[in-house]
C-alpha cells in the first residue's frame, strides 16, 4: 500500500472514530470518509436496488486499493453465480480467490431442500466465518442477505438472537462488515423482521423509486453512530465499474472564475455580451421551438473548433444526420469537424435511460474527450417524465462538473408558450446558469419576427435591448433593437412615439455604462 493510500485509509473524524474508505464512487464523500472501522453497517433496500453489488464492491475495492483480504458470506446466490455476475464489471473474483485474498463462504440454501431438526443455531456458520477471517487475515466482511435466513426458518425470535450473536462475534474480531437486508417498501420500515434493532450502529438505505415513467436509484445514510455524514438521498447509477453515487451536496463553490472571454460565434451577440461569454460560464438559450436555439449552439461549437478547441454536442431531440444537414445549410460542416477530431456528437433519446445514467455518460465523455466547450440540446427534453427535484439535481451535476473542469457550457431550453412571456424559473435552472439568452416570436405589423435579449449575465455589462433576430443562409443575423415598440416580452408589442431628446440621453447613458464596465 502506498503512503498516500495509507493516509486515505487511516481517515479519522474529529471525534476519534476511525473510518475505512470504501473507494465506491461518491460514497466516501457522503459518509465523510467511509465506514467506521470494526463496526457493522446495515444496507437495506427493496429488490433491485444494488445491495449485493454494493457489498461485493466494498470487498473488491478493499483488495484492489489497500490489499485488504475479505470474506463474502452468501445466503442467497451460489458462489459460482456471484463469480459469474462479477465478470460484468471486470472483476476477476476467481483470481482473487486463488491468490488467497477473497473467500466466499457458501451459506445458500440446499436446492434439494433440508429438514430442520432441533433448535435453529448459527454456531457452525459463526465458527466457519471466524476461521476464514483469521486464516485470510480479513479486514472486511460482507453478508448477503440475512433476510434469506428469516425466510427459511419460522422461529423469528430465535433467528434474531443468532444474528445478534453473529454481529457480536464480528465486532470482537474487529472486522468492518456490511450486512444486506430486504425491505418491503421504498419509504416504509427500515428493514423486515426488525433487523435494524440489533444491527444499529450504521444504517444505509438504497431505493429504486418509480418517478413518472422512469426508475430512479438513490442512497441515504440514515445514521453512522459516533461520526458525521451527509443527510438526505443522493442519486446513484450502476455502471460498468459498479455503483456510482453523485454526491451533489458535497460539491463546493470553490472553482476558479476566469476573466477570459470566448466568442459565441456571432459577432453581434458577442458585442451584446460585453465581448463574449466568460470562458468557464454556463449559458442558457431559452425560447419556443424554431427560435434558433440550435443554430446558436452550432455557431458556438463551430467557433471553438475553428480556434482548435475540442467540443462535444449532447443532442436529445435530433439525429446526427439531421443536425449535420441543418448545420450545413448554415455553412457549418459538422462531419468535417468530427473527422478532424475536434467535434464529437452524441445523440440519444432522453427516455433511453435515467437522468443519473445520462449524467454519468456526460461526465465520462468529458473525461475521455477533454473538450473546452460542451452543448446540451435540449434540457427540456431531459425534463420530460421526471420530478423537478431529479431534474434540478441533474442540472447541478452537469454544471458543477463543467465548472470544475473549466469548460464553457451552452444549454438550450424549449418553452411551452409559442408567443408572449414565459417563465424561465419554473424549470429550476435559471439561478444555476451564468448567462441567459431569451429568444421569442414577436408579431409586428401582421408579420412574425424573432427577438433576442441578453436577459442575464453574471459579472459583466450586457446589452439590455430587445433586438430583432433573423435566420439567414449564413446563420443568425441580429439587427437593431425594437426602438419604437414596447411590451415586446409580454407578446403584445405596442408602437410608441419617440422622444428624440430622451432617446439621445438613453444612448449616452448606455455608452457611459459600457465604458465604466470596460475600465
UniProtKB/Swiss-Prot annotation:
Record-listed Mg(2+) 1 binding positions: 52
Residue numbers binding Mg(2+) 2: 294, 317
PTM annotation (Phosphothreonine): residues: 431
Top-level taxon: Bacteria
Cofactor note: Binds 2 Mg(2+) ions per subunit, one in each domain. Mg(2+) is required for hexamerization and phosphatase activity.
Family listed: Belongs to the KaiC family.
Name the UniProt record assigns to this protein: Circadian clock oscillator protein KaiC
Organism: Nostoc sp. (strain PCC 7120 / SAG 25.82 / UTEX 2576)
Origin organism lineage: Bacteria, Bacillati, Cyanobacteriota, Cyanophyceae, Nostocales
